[in-house]
Design a protein with these regions (language model features):
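Bacterial N-terminal signal peptides that target proteins for export
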Residues: 1-7
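C-terminal motif of bacterial Sec signal peptides marking the signal peptidase cleavage site
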Residues: 15-18
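Noncatalytic modules at the cell exterior or secretory-pathway interfaces
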Residues: 25-32, 78-88, 136-141, 145
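Extended low-complexity, serine/threonine- and proline-enriched intrinsically disordered segments
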Residues: 34-53, 102-107
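Extracellular carbohydrate recognition and processing domains
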Residues: 51-79, 124-126, 132
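Extracellular beta-strand ligand-recognition surfaces/modules
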Residues: 70-96
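Extracellular carbohydrate recognition
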Residues: 93-105
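Compositionally biased low-complexity segments at domain edges in trafficked proteins
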Residues: 117-161
Length: 171
């Protein structure tokens, strides 16, 4: 019994310390609340200035397991990277009929902001060359079902940059 109490105490201490450490990190975390039915990959591009000239070397791939239910996909940027602009490319799986994007949450240190539903499209715009959108239900589809490139979101002007800068500020 004594060993069990000691184990519980030690476990609680580890949990508390790890939670405290995560809140003070200098990493930007982006959570996407999505429905992606087929296994796929998402590519996140970033710039560290206000440019929207996105390059392959400034991007991350995130593998996503298919599910008919909502799932949260978390992208954590290294401490040394504080993106100013972001682009989201939703997959390369041609079998992916649509993606439902419900919410995006950005967290940095103890601050966060989110965009839900149509609010997402105040911060991001769709790439009209390859994306069809239904803002009411958050549906993103390929414009041509045979194209390799999936739906894409680009920053809408400097709105995302301003929100991210507020997140990074010490105030």
């Amino acid at each position: 019994m004594k060993l069990f109490k000691m184990f519980i105490t030690l476990f609680s201490l580890v949990v508390l310390l790890s939670c405290e450490k995560n809140e003070n990190t200098n990493s930007l975390k982006m959570d996407l609340d999505v429905v992606i039915r087929e296994t796929d990959s998402i590519q996140i591009y970033y710039t560290q200035n206000t440019s929207v000239q996105f390059k392959e070397k400034q991007s991350f791939w995130k593998k996503v397991s298919g599910s008919k239910k909502n799932q949260t996909i978390s992208i954590v940027f290294p401490d040394s990277i504080h993106p100013k602009q972001l682009r989201i490319d939703f997959g390369r799986n041609i079998k992916q009929s649509e993606i439902i994007l419900n919410e995006i949450i950005f967290s940095y240190k103890k601050k966060s902001f989110s965009a839900k539903g149509e609010e997402i499209y105040h911060l991001f715009r769709v790439d009209e060359s390859n994306t069809l959108i239904d803002k009411l239900i958050g549906s993103l589809k390929r414009k041509d079902e045979n194209q390799l490139v999936g739906p894409s979101l680009y920053p809408k002007g400097d709105k995302l940059n301003k929100q991210l800068n507020q997140l990074y500020s010490e105030k």
